[in-house]
């Protein structure tokens, strides 16, 4: 599964790249995973694009 750790800086890159998997939390200060078992190609792109390296596979 995919998760976003506390290093997230809310840049929203993952949400823009892969909106079927990531969204911002209600406070808008962290991305959250809405589809943790997704194998969409955009997940790898989101992981590679995260400036905080906050997206991890568990």
From Swiss-Prot:
Ferredoxins are iron-sulfur proteins that transfer electrons in a wide variety of metabolic reactions. PANTHER family: FERREDOXIN (PTHR36923:SF3). It comes from Megalodesulfovibrio gigas. This is Ferredoxin-2. Keywords: 3Fe-4S, Disulfide bond, Electron transport, Iron, Iron-sulfur, Metal-binding, Methylation, Repeat, Transport. InterPro entries: 3Fe4S_ferredoxin, 4Fe4S_Fe-S-bd, 4Fe4S_Fe_S_CS, Fe-S_cluster_ET. It comes from the Bacteria. The keyword Cell membrane does not apply. It holds the Pfam family Fer4_13. Homodimer (ferredoxin I) or homotetramer (ferredoxin II).
